[in-house]
Amino acid sequence: MWLGVITLFPEMFRAVTDFGVTGRAVKNGLLELHTWNPRDFTHDRHNTVDDRPYGGGPGMLMMVQPLRDAIHAAKAAAGEEAKVIYLSPQGRKLDQQGVTELAKSSRLILVCGRYEGIDERIIQTEVDEEWSVGDYVLSGGELPAMTMIDAVSRLVPGVLGKQASAEQDSFSDGLLDCPHYTRPESLDGLDVPAVLLSGNHEQIRLWRLQQSLGRTLLRRPELLQNLALTDEQSTLLAQFVEAMDKHA
């Protein structure tokens, strides 16, 4: 996957290129990330990248010309098929379904705003989609962009050691993930569930699915409203609720 990022702080993206899963993906050639800094497209000796908004008010906006030129440079490098995304609290909220959709694109250009945002005409003429990581305001688009890159890259074939790791993540099937355990078998009087030690793969699968359904019901019940549960899932969830009521 090819990724271009428009940012005033390209150094921040070393967190993506140099560390963890995404760092290995870059090293192995599965993820290609390039940055364009609007400051490199300024024409004054101060490298000015902000400007006052029309109509007054507090704060500044990113200057149109350097930002637009940086986007054009990224588009030229990416090719016509690249999708341009502006990270904005006004955009569509990123969830696993959205991540799956974005992962189908081979080339993405992410525009990171700063100050009070960017000129609306840049959004109208240069941006294909706006995305948000939540209903809160950050100082810039860099952290949302890194969040998006990390989430999307996990779905690129070969990035994870086993594709099943991505398929079992929370939200991959609309449910929260089940509990996980490693050694020791007993920790401060808390034991690993016996079914996980049984070696019975079918029983383990059913237990994990039931725990996933139950955890979703308890922590994010609204997620279940959007799902058409199978007969198996409905039965497991009913058993979970019955067991929970008995221990209440």
UniProtKB/Swiss-Prot annotation:
Belongs to the RNA methyltransferase TrmD family. Homodimer. Specifically methylates guanosine-37 in various tRNAs. CDD domains: TrmD-like. S-adenosyl-L-methionine binds at G113, V133, G134, D135, Y136, V137, L138. Keywords: Cytoplasm, Methyltransferase, S-adenosyl-L-methionine, Transferase, tRNA processing. It is found in: Cytoplasm. One of its GO terms (cellular component) is cytosol. It is an enzyme of class 2 (transferase). Its EC number is 2.1.1.228. It catalyses: guanosine(37) in tRNA + S-adenosyl-L-methionine = N(1)-methylguanosine(37) in tRNA + S-adenosyl-L-homocysteine + H(+). This is tRNA (guanine-N(1)-)-methyltransferase. It comes from Shewanella sp. (strain W3-18-1). Transmembrane segments: none annotated. GO terms for biological process: tRNA N1-guanine methylation. Its main location: cytoplasm. It comes from the Bacteria.
